[in-house]
Amino acid sequence: MGNRIPDEIVDQVQKSADIVEVIGDYVQLKKQGRNYFGLCPFHGESTPSFSVSPDKQIFHCFGCGAGGNVFSFLRQMEGYSFAESVSHLADKYQIDFPDDITVHSGARPESSGEQKMAEAHELLKKFYHHLLINTKEGQEALDYLLSRGFTKELINEFQIGYALDSWDFITKFLVKRGFSEAQMEKAGLLIRREDGSGYFDRFRNRVMFPIHDHHGAVVAFSGRALGSQQPKYMNSPETPLFHKSKLLYNFYKARLHIRKQERAVLFEGFADVISAVSSDVKESIATMGTSLTDDHVKILRRNVEEIILCYDSDKAGYEATLKASELLQKKGCKVRVAMIPDGLDPDDYIKKFGGEKFKNDIIDASVTVMAFKMQYFRKGKNLSDEGDRLAYIKDVLKEISTLSGSLEQEVYVKQLASEFSLSQESLTEQLSVFSKQNKPADNSGETKTRRAHLTTKARQKRLRPAYENAERLLLAHMLRDRSVIKKVIDRVGFQFNIDEHRALAAYLYAFYEEGAELTPQHLMARVTDDHISQLLSDILMLQVNQELSEAELSDYVKKVLNQRNWSMIKEKEAERAEAERQKDFLRAASLAQEIVTLNRSLK
């Protein structure tokens, strides 16, 4: 069992770690007054309700209630243990961390196996790269890359490598270094023979592209065949390390550029990303052989608002663009589309016309989703033909009718009227027909029920019982004034009605008894339970008077203690009813007297 992290190390790490900087690696934050706000990473939202306080060094979401300090943020975001979060930040801020502390959480028994998988991937990334750059076996692969426009600088930047044309070289290479074959199969690096006689290498005679997770660790590979081998591209399978529906290629490198440019450029494949980065579009990322998912969108939305889609110009690429734009817009993203000329993908375009033209004429000249759709609707239609022209105009009007802004609708109606020499009035009239068709039937009863439900839900969230509010206010004053802690110890002790309140009070009592300095930062560092940490951030956000008057204190204490008596009265009344049912009138009379006594204590 590892030793406990010394308090002075925890304090040093917390003082050095800037919570705005740490959370800013995950969430796009904007300063509003003294605090910073962004979209909560713990629940879906389109309006920022996630607050970070640099003064108090805490975060709090007014939407879902998540909250805590820099350590609890990493615990909730990454699944770290407390020790892991302290160790991670100590490393980030170059603070010496004791060697005798066990960092990995016992709650993750698979972590040692995953660690071996990660080590194998990192080792192979370096080995594959060495084979490509420094050996005669890798010369053909290197020549291929150079002929395709890859520079040696780009090859080094993305650590591109080469897998030998061998069935068992990597198998022997890994076994010799102490890796289990079964574990490496689970990591996606080896394949078990059908007859069960052993294992063979998954990647053979391929140019190897390492795939990193969002923190920069290698978790998978994609191999491009050099000869006639099929498939042309082979990706690692899903593994405990690699989940393609949750990973965006190059995101760990692109994140800072995305923040700086305030946009992300999304491609369909990693080859497009590498070419785009060489063209100085460094905010480039890609999905890994899968359609855009909700998880991808959540990652993007936490970091940026504007997404430029740059997919292939074939039919499949157009349809993927439509699907991705719809998903992104539903989550509150501003979407634009980079239009590639027909028959080309982004990589082809860059090789044909150059990186500067790609950046200026394609990426920086991206269009709105509506403009892209208007171009898409033209495909396969002869606009000189009246039938095709009418079909096109109807398609465009239907799409315009789905736009939420009347100003935006007017812009495209004017554009349509000008292009086809039609009156704007007739188009607007037809537009109103489509707009009415878009509106769902209003079931007033159902609507009222839904509104009532939402109102009730909001009221439940906003209104708390009097005793609960009293406990929260007592805790808030205790956090601001040491003298209040002593008064609450004497009058309430541990008689808080809510378990989390009782636990937080225990922390405050301990600080008081130790004579320790009581600050939000010190208390947050001591609290390792996420529920208590969340409660603490919530309480710290409460607005209370600078001083607690004796009348207010007495009122809060009375509400807290009376609640326990109310609970006891209910229990006694239930016992009395049962005694009367059993015809035990002597016990019923005794219980009635106890109830009278309890009722008197409420006054």
UniProtKB/Swiss-Prot annotation:
GO BP terms:
DNA replication, synthesis of primer
What residues does Mg(2+) 1 bind to?
A: E268, D312
Q: Give a yes or no for keyword Transcription regulation in this entry.
A: no
Q: Name one cellular component (GO) term.
A: primosome complex
List the CHC2-type ZnF regions, as residue ranges.
40-64
For this UniProt entry, the molecular function terms from Gene Ontology, in alphabetical order, are: ATP binding; DNA binding; DNA helicase activity; DNA-directed RNA polymerase activity; zinc ion binding
Q: Which residues form a coiled coil?
A: none
Question: Which Enzyme Commission numbers does its entry carry?
Answer: 2.7.7.101
Domain Toprim positions? 262-343
Q: Which SMART domains does this UniProt record tie to the protein?
A: TOPRIM, ZnF_CHCC
Q: Which reaction does it catalyse?
A: ssDNA + n NTP = ssDNA/pppN(pN)n-1 hybrid + (n-1) diphosphate
Names of required cofactors: Zn(2+); Mg(2+)
Record flagged with keyword Transferase: yes
Give the signal sequence positions: none
Binding residues annotated for Mg(2+) 2, in chain numbering: D312, D314
Cofactor note text:
Binds 1 zinc ion per monomer.
> To which protein family does this belong?
Belongs to the DnaG primase family.
Q: Show the domain comment.
A: Contains an N-terminal zinc-binding domain, a central core domain that contains the primase activity, and a C-terminal DnaB-binding domain.
Name of the protein in question: DNA primase
Question: Lineage in the entry?
Answer: Bacteria, Bacillati, Bacillota, Bacilli, Bacillales
Q: Name the encoding gene, please.
A: dnaG
